[in-house]
Amino acid sequence: MSLSSLLKVVTASLWLGPGIAQKITQTQPGMFVQEKEAVTLDCTYDTSDPSYGLFWYKQPSSGEMIFLIYQGSYDQQNATEGRYSLNFQKARKSANLVISASQLGDSAMYFCAMRE
């Protein structure tokens, strides 16, 4: 396994908007992943609002924030956008990001965010 085929993934969280009572938690401080492997990044949340949206962003070393995917609380199916998909489980209050066939360009800080 060469170093060039490893990805470094770091997770963080943020929230958007005034909100009623919300909390976002990402428990994985960082990980190394073999290129072409699938990666799952955990995000759990707590909110008292029945209507909300969950977002995932990535921030590569260049610094810009890049929007990846959105899931609305009333959406019937898990969101999918290219190699990115969400494993959204409303009852468990989780919205885990799945990156299929990881690439070196996926090395970044990842942010889970919520808007009520």
Curated annotation (Swiss-Prot):
One of its GO terms (biological process) is adaptive immune response. Its main location: membrane. Disulfide bonds join C43-C112. It is found in: Cell membrane. InterPro entries: Ig-like_dom (IPR007110), Ig-like_dom_sf (IPR036179), Ig-like_fold (IPR013783), Ig_V-set (IPR013106), TCR_variable_region (IPR051287). Residues 1-21 form the signal peptide. SUPFAM superfamilies: Immunoglobulin (SSF48726). It comes from the Eukaryota. Keywords: Adaptive immunity, Cell membrane, Disulfide bond, Glycoprotein, Immunity, Immunoglobulin domain, Membrane, Receptor, Signal, T cell receptor. Gene3D superfamilies: Immunoglobulins. The keyword Membrane applies. SMART domains: IGv. Residues 22-116 form the Ig-like domain. One of its GO terms (cellular component) is T cell receptor complex. Glycans are attached at N78. V region of the variable domain of T cell receptor (TR) alpha chain that participates in the antigen recognition. Alpha-beta T cell receptors are antigen specific receptors which are essential to the immune response and are present on the cell surface of T lymphocytes. Recognize peptide-major histocompatibility (MH) (pMH) complexes that are displayed by antigen presenting cells (APC), a prerequisite for efficient T cell adaptive immunity against pathogens. Alpha-beta TR is a heterodimer composed of an alpha and beta chain; disulfide-linked. The alpha-beta TR is associated with the transmembrane signaling CD3 coreceptor proteins to form the TR-CD3 (TcR or TCR). The assembly of alpha-beta TR heterodimers with CD3 occurs in the endoplasmic reticulum where a single alpha-beta TR heterodimer associates with one CD3D-CD3E heterodimer, one CD3G-CD3E heterodimer and one CD247 homodimer forming a stable octameric structure. CD3D-CD3E and CD3G-CD3E heterodimers preferentially associate with TR alpha and TR beta chains, respectively. This is T cell receptor alpha variable 14/delta variable 4. It comes from Homo sapiens. The gene is TRAV14DV4.
